[in-house]
Amino acid sequence: MDPIIQTIQLFQHTLHHDANVIKAAEAQLQQIKVTDGYSRILLKILASNEVDISIRQGVSIFLKNMIITKWRGAEDESPITQEDAEFIKENLIDLLVHSHHLVQNQIEAMIEIIANRDFPEKWTSLLPKSIQYINTQDVKLILAGLTSIQLGIKRFRYVTMGDKKKELLYTIVNEIFPLLLQILEFLSQHQTIESALMQKKVIKIFGYAIHFEIPDLLIQPEVFNKWLSQFVRIIQRPITPQENVKHADDCRKNQWWLLKRTTAKLLNLLFRKSATSVRSTDHSSVKALNKLFMPVYSVEVMKVFYEQLSTLEQLYKGVHYERYQQKLIEYFSFAIKYGVTYVAMKPWLSTLIQQVLFPIICFNDRDAELWECDPNEFLRSQFESSMTFATARIEVLNFIIDVVGKRGRANLDMIMGFCIQSLNKYNAATNASEKNPREKDGVLVIISVLSAYLKNISFYKSNLEQMLLLHVFPELSSPHGFLKARACSLFSEFYNIEFTDPVYFSNALKLILGLMSDNDLPVRVKAGTSICNLVRANQGVDELRPILPQLLDKIFSLLSEAESEDLVIAIESIIQRFKHEIAPYAVNLCKNLSEQFLRLLELEESDESGESGFASQECLGVYCTLLRALKDIPDVFNSLEQQIVPILQKLFTSDHMMYLDEALRILTFVTYYPKSISPLVWSLFPQIMNLFDECACDFASSYVNPLDNYISYGTEYFLSNQQYIEMVFNMYKKMVGDINQQPVDAGDCCKIMESLIQRAKGRIDYMIVPVLELACGRLLNTDKNNQKSKEFTVYLLEIIANCIYYNPLISTQYLESKNLVEPIFGLWFNRIKHFQRFYDKKISVLAFSSLLTLNPSPNFVKFGTSLILEKMLQFTKDMLSIEKELDKQEAEREQKIKDGTLKPEEEEFIDENDEEDYFDNHKFEFEFTEIPDNQDCQHDDEGEVFLDDIEKATEYFENGGDLGEDEGDNFDDQNDDDDQDSEEDLFEDEDTPDFETPIDEVDGFEFMINSIQNFFQINPTCIQQISEKQQEKIKKYVASAPARKEKLRLEKEKEEKLKQQQQKK
C-alpha cells in the first residue's frame, strides 16, 4: 500500500469511536514513525488540500511532537535523519504559506523548535527565503516571511550580553532591519487586517532583538528616530468604527487593538531599558540608549500616551482593549521614578489622576453585569482578590500607591483632597439623582489602598473616625449592593482605630453580621471576609463570643457559595481570637472544615483557574490553627482525628503533592499535642514513608517533625514494628548513601536518624554499624559530584557522635576496624568551629565523654587525651556561656511579668505567620522621604543585585563553572585553615527545632566530669598528657558541680510547679 494512503488511514482510525481501533492505530504509528523518510510523508500530507482537515490537524500535531523529541539536540534513540531534516527545513516555510489556517499554529511551532536549535548556523535558508517572500507583493508570502523571521529571532531574546550568539543577531539585524523599517513605513498606507497583523509581527521582531541588549544599528540616532516615529504613529492612529468590534471582550482578537497593545508594550520596554541606572560595567549600547531616549523621547512618548488615555473612553465609547489601556498606564508608573519624566508630568498630574485615571477604578457597567450574572467572577475581579492580574484598574491603583510612596506628602494631600471633596459633595446632595454611587465606590477604593499612610499620619488618623461615621458606616445600609460590600472592606481596613464611643464600633459590627445574610453574594462574602480583621480589634469581642457557633456556621455556608480564601482566613482569625472558647465547637468545626476542603479539592481538580487551589490550601492552614488552639486539651484530639485522618489519607498520595507540606504540618500537630499516637494516626505512617520513597525526597524537611513525634511519643509501638524501623533506616540510606542527593534534604534525614538512635538506646545495636558506614562514607567521599555543605558535614559528624553516645564500644570497634579513626576525628576537630548551636556542642561533649568511659580505653583515646579534653572543655565553656545568657533572658522576662509590662504567654495569641500585630494601633508617625522633583527616585537595590547576579551566573557557566556546594573542600586534607570561615554563621536558614530528646534530661556538664574522673582512675598515667591549665580547669569544674546540681534541681522544681499551675487553669 502507498505509505501516504496508509498513513492517512491510520490517522482516520485515531478518530474512530472504538477505543480498540484507536489504540491499534496509535501503536502502528509509533512503530512506523522511526522509518527513514517518514517525516517527509507527513509533510506531504500536510501540503495536500485534498486530505480532510481533521486528518491534517492530527498529522500536524504528530509531526510537531516528532520534531520536539527527535530533532538535533533531543535525546532520542532514533533521531530524524539529516536528509529528512533538510527536507523539512526546505519546505516548512512554503507549507506555512499554503496550509490551512487550522494547522498553521502547529507549523509555526515546528519552525520555532527547529530555529531554536538550528538557526542561523544550521538553517541557513530561513533568512534568505524569508527576505525573498517579504520582497514580493503577495500578502500570504509576506506574512510567512515575517513569521519565520519572528520565530528565528525569538531564540535570541534571552541571550545575554557578551554571548557570542549576540554577534549572530547583530549580523541578522544589520541585514533585515532596514527592510523591516521600509515595510512598516509602507504598511502605514494600508488599512487592512493583514496590514495590522504584519505590523504587529515587525514590532515583535524589534522587541525580541532588543530584549537584553539593543544592537548598535538601532541605537544610531537617525535610525532610532525613524523606528520611534513608526511606533508613535501606530499608537496615535485611531481605530475606525468599521475596524473596531462591538463588544469590549472581543478586542483581544482584533488585530488593530493587538497591534496597539504590542507597540505600547515595546515602548514600555524601551523606557525601562533606557531608564535603568547605568553602571560602569554596562555595554556601550545601554549607555547610548539612556542618553538618546531619556532626555527627549521619554517625555514625548508620555505625552502621546496621556493623549491616548484622555480620549480613549470618549473616542471608543467603552469598546476598547483593556490590556492596551493597562500598558499605557504602566508607562506612567515608570515615569514617576525619574526626574525628567516626573517634572514633565507634574503640571497635569492632578488632572491625570482625577479626570483620566479615577473613572477607571469606579464601579462600571462591566462590574454591574458581573454582579448580576456572575457574582463569583465579580469577587475575583476586585482589587482585594486579584493582585496577580494585570488590569487597567490594578495599574491605576499601583500608580496611586507609587505616586504617593515615591513622590511624597504633597501628592497624598492632593489625592485625599480630591477624595474628601467628592465624599462631601456626595453627602451634600439632597436629591438621590444628584449622588453618584459609582464615583463614591472609586473614592473608597483609593482610601483603602492609601490606608497605610492614613493610619500613620496624625492629621489623617485623627479624622478617620469621622470619615467612617459620615461616609462609610451609612453605606452598610446602602440600597446599592456594591457600596455595602465596599463599606465592609473599608471598615475592616480601619478595624483598629480608637473610637470615642465603643457603640460606634458595636453598631457597625452588628450591621456587618447582618449583611452576612444579604441578598447579594458579593455583599455576604465581603461581610464574611471583613470578620478576618474585625475579630482582631480590642472592641467587639463581647458581641461575637455568644454567637461563635452561628458565626462559624454562616462563614462555612458562604464557603459553599464562593471559593474565597479570605473566608477561610476569617475562620482562622476567629479561632485565633477565641482559642480558649473554641473547644466546645471544635469537632463540628473540624467536620465542616473537612467537608469544605473535600469540596474545594474536587473543584480544583476541574478548575483551570486555580482559584479553589488557594482556598483549599488555606483550609489546611485552618486545621493547624485549630489544633494549636486546642493544644492544652489533648482529650479532644481523638475526636478530631476521626475527621482529619481521612483527609490526610487522601493527601498523602502522589496526586496531591502540592498539599504535602501542609498535610505533614497537620500530622505534626496531631502527633505532638496529644503526647501519644493513636492507632488511627499510626495507620498513616507506612503511607507517608512509601510516599517519600516514591516521590517526596524533596520534602525531607517537612518529614522531620512528624517522624520525630512518631518516634518520640510512640517509641514502644515504633520499636515493636521492625518494618517501621527499616523504613526510617531506608530513608536515611536513600538520602545519605546517594552522593547526588542535596545536602539540605540528606541533613534532614540525619535529624530523623538521630531521633531514632537517642530514643532506642540499647535496643538497635544491629543498626549502629550500617548507620556509621553510611555517614563515614558520605563524609569522606572525595568524588567531585558529592553534594556537600558545612551544615551537612556537621549533621553527619553528629550521627557519628550519636552512635558513640549510644554505644561507644560498637562505634569505636567499627571505626578502628576500618581505619577511620584518624580521618573522622581529624575532620571533626578541624570543623569544630562549625558546631555553633547548643545541641551541636552538647552531643559532641556526650560523645567525647562516652569515649572516656570505655574500659579498657582505646589506644587512640589514651594517646589523644589532651586533644579530646581540649575540645570537651571548650564546648563546655561555650555551653555554660549560653546557659548564662538564657538565665539572664529568663530573669528579665520574669521581671517584666512582675512589673506588668509583659503578660505570660501573650505572644501565643498571635499566629507565628501573622504579619500585623493584632492590637497595633499605629502609634508611630510616618515620615516621607522627600526627593526633589527633578531627581530620580532611589533605585531598587535588589533589582540591581539581581542584574549583577545574572551576569555573574552567565559568566560562570560560560567558563565551565560548577555550582557544587563547598567546591574544593577536600575532606582528606586535615591541615586546611579553618579560620577563614570561623566567623560564618551556619544554620541561619533553619527553624530551630524544639525537639524533646532524651539528652535534654542529661546534664552534659555532670556527664563530662564523671567520665573524666572515671578515665583517669582507669588510666592514671594519662594525666601527664594534659596541661596544667587543663588540670586547673577540670578541678574548677569538679568543685562547682555540687552547686550546679542544686541549681538544676531548683529549676526543675520550679518548672514542675508552673506545669501544675497551667494544668489547673
Swiss-Prot record:
Q: Subcellular location, in the record's words? A: Cytoplasm; Nucleus
Q: Which Pfam families match?
A: Cse1 (PF08506), IBN_N (PF03810)
Choose one Gene Ontology CC annotation of this protein and give it: nuclear envelope
InterPro entries in the record: ARM-like, ARM-type_fold, Importin-beta_N, XPO2_central
Major localization listed first in the record, in broad terms:
cytoplasm
Keywords, A to Z, come to: Cytoplasm, Nucleus, Protein transport, Transport
User: What are the GO MF terms of this UniProt record?
Assistant: small GTPase binding
Function text: May function in nuclear protein import.
Task: Spell out the family assignment given in the record's similarity comment.
Answer: Belongs to the importin beta family.
Record's protein name: Probable importin-7 homolog
- Organism per entry: Dictyostelium discoideum
